[in-house]
């Protein structure tokens, strides 16, 4: 079931996204895979927030933030890492929720393979693994093998997706999905409630200098996959 709360302000939508799932379909080395992850950490942004990409109005870069709710806004951070936001609020008002961390549920070893490939800097998963119906040109498995030689210690499970760039690398989210409708493959957002006993924490956002004290970061407390703030 697609979340019906995304027409709300980002500060309403961001905590409600916690527990929702992202399902990504890819083809890697000729085999189709389904990657499923549960959102455990988000940050809220909108056009009235000086820390937001939407601040100052629409542009070629941030146009998706002003588009329909339930679509994807993807950008590159520090020239290296893709980050993704779920667009919210009615079309015309720039708003979105950064997906800051997810908990892997299905396809964990494929996510690990993609993340390990990225660690050696050659196979940037978001560019080199195609969507469903297309094959992988990057041989990410070979790159992962190289990564294993370079690093003695493989990635710990909790480190696979505990940051916005890691999320996009593990789920193969890049600019090809800019503006993507999250009701459709190859990346689908589904509503799911919090598990019994789970509670939501709130804090300032991570790594920003403007409006830095605003409590716009939301996370599932005690979840091992929440990023280190």
Residue locations for each model-derived region?
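Conserved, well-structured core segments that form or line functional sites
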Residues: 1-128, 134-137, 142-229
